[in-house]
Curated annotation (Swiss-Prot):
Keywords: Iron, Manganese, Metal-binding, Oxidoreductase
Cofactor note: Contains a nonheme dinuclear iron cluster that stabilizes a peroxo intermediate. Was originally suggested to contain a binuclear manganese cluster or a heterodinuclear manganese/iron cluster.
Domain of life of the source: Bacteria
The protein's annotated pathway: Antibiotic biosynthesis
Protein name: 4-aminobenzoate N-oxygenase
Described function: Involved in the biosynthesis of the polyketide antibiotic aureothin. Catalyzes the oxidation of p-aminobenzoate (pABA) to p-nitrobenzoate (pNBA), an unusual polyketide synthase starter unit. Reaction mechanism involves the generation of a peroxodiiron(III/III) intermediate, which effects the initial oxidation of p-aminobenzoate to p-hydroxylaminobenzoate (Ar-NHOH). Ar-NHOH is then probably directly converted to the fully oxidized p-nitrobenzoate via a four-electron N-oxidation, bypassing the formation of a nitroso compound.
Organism: Streptomyces thioluteus
Name of one Pfam family that matches: AurF
Outcome when changing residue 202 to F: 3.5-fold increase in activity
């Protein structure tokens, strides 16, 4: 996306900087100071050594969250075919996480680091966002490693081309209808903020699952720990930026929020069809067709607690047109 945004060519140093009045968030300061103790990149860089316990009889992905797990045609498939689907869904899960980091979260962080929004030149905001960017690079590495090791251990020699990340497709559609650069910047910021406040719900689906490969749970647990902090950072940063936006920018942010929430929650049925076909499951089209007609069958993420907190912090409870569901028991935001 950078090539579409020439205004990012100048670094923040070229403009100087100033501590913004009112940006002294105790929460943000605490999160910045905790980074050396919390960040996976600092404390778990030797993750490559954790693969010794891989057991080929243990599934790669939780059957419980497979949306077609109880479909008669899936149950009628051979055990090795069902296992191949679970492995493919684990690889696809990692691919989705990587794409979310690279296409959604990092471009939003880049806008903040380049001082695009009033208040984003503040040193505390810059430091917190830069720490998050370092984290995201390591997360991408962890999930790339997960894909490579799974391919090696499961002896998978090929994978069909995958569809573009559905969340990003929805963002590009929104950007195409926005003639003004400032409005496109707001949309990118909102998509990134939603990703960073909701991705922990996606990670929690696997992080606390005891039925899958221990290494898969470890990777998602480490990522979840970082993203829990990122969610809090993003809430604080967006609140500070929103307070300094003009009315046009604020209205654009409110318009984008529900669209971004729906986009992040969406289950890409075309990706599921690819996994079923790759495993040779008979009736793959019928399985996906039945899923499409099922209530909730097209929704992957069902926990929006982090995004809901952001909306509340912005004072937009009544302005954002989105039906937030009840927080599920497995939510990372549920007190333990």
């Amino acid at each position: 996306m950078r090539e579409e945004q020439p205004h990012l060519a100048t670094t923040w140093a070229a403009r100087g900087w100033v501590e913004e009045e009112g940006i002294g968030s105790a929460t943000l300061g605490r999160l910045v100071r905790a980074w050396p103790r919390r960040a996976a990149v600092v404390n778990k860089a030797d993750i490559l050594d954790e693969w010794a316990d891989y057991d080929t009889l243990v599934p790669d992905y939780p059957l419980e969250i497979v949306p077609f797990a109880e479909h008669p045609l899936f149950l009628a498939a051979e055990p090795h075919q069902r296992q191949r689907v679970l492995t493919g869904m684990w690889i696809g899960y990692n691919e989705r996480v990587i794409a979310t980091e690279q296409l959604i979260a990092e471009p939003a962080f880049d806008l903040v680091m380049h001082g695009v929004f009033p208040g984003s030149d503040d040193p505390l905001i810059r430091k917190s966002v830069q720490q998050a960017i370092v984290d995201e690079s390591f997360h991408t590495y962890m999930h790339m490693l997960a894909i490579d090791r799974t391919r090696e251990l499961r002896k998978i020699s090929e994978r069909p081309p995958q569809p573009e990340l559905v969340t990003y497709r929805r963002l590009r559609r929104v950007l195409a209808d926005m003639p003004e650069q400032w409005e496109r910047d707001i949309a990118v910021l909102v998509w990134g903020a939603v990703a960073e406040t909701c991705i922990n719900a996606l990670l929690a689906l696997l992080a606390r699952d005891a039925t899958i490969q221990p290494m898969h749970s470890l990777i998602t647990t480490l990522h979840l720990r970082d993203e829990t902090a990122h969610g809090s950072i993003v809430v604080e940063v967006v609140r500070e930026l929103y307070a300094r936006m003009n009315e046009q920018q604020r209205r654009a942010l409110v318009r984008c929020l529900p669209i971004a929430l729906e986009a992040f929650a969406e289950q890409d049925l075309s990706a599921l069809l690819l996994e079923l076909n790759a495993a040779g499951i008979r009736g793959a089209e019928e399985i996906v067709g039945d899923l499409r007609s099922t209530a909730g069958g097209t929704r992957l993420v069902r926990d929006f607690s982090g995004a809901r907190k952001m909306v509340e912090q912005l004072g937009l409870d009544d302005a954002v047109d989105f039906d937030f569901p009840e927080r599920p028991d497995w939510s990372p935001h549920t007190p333990r």
